[in-house]
Amino acid sequence: MDSTYGSLFTSNTESGNKQRKAVINRKTNETDISMTLNLDGSGKANITTGIGFFDHMLDSFTRHGLFDMDCNVKGDLYVDTHHSIEDTGIVLGKAIKEAVGDKKSIKRYGSMMLPMDETLVLCALDLSGRPYLVF
């Protein structure tokens, strides 16, 4: 979400502070995920999950949020997509938490409703620290 829509993340780069970044790796029996997230980016996305629509959604999240994200997911897609999506959500949450650090430069929660193509997108985000992902 950029400033046009009321960003959750106030940019640190305007005041000369370092960019807020995180690198998270998670390996389980079902998945192997690596993610680099820069909250003060420009919308660059390099996402490979093996799930086309999920890649598209993460790419849209990154581009419209003006974040930079590299995300590589290897999962047990021969079973189904559940583990890959769930574990990517866990990694994304950890990356956001690490990148915002002390939370001094953010608003705790925000929401956005956006008509995009034939879809109405509703996103609500709360950075209180309680884990939850709906896809």
State where each predicted segment sits:
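Structural preference for solvent-exposed beta-strand-turn elements
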Residues: D2-F135
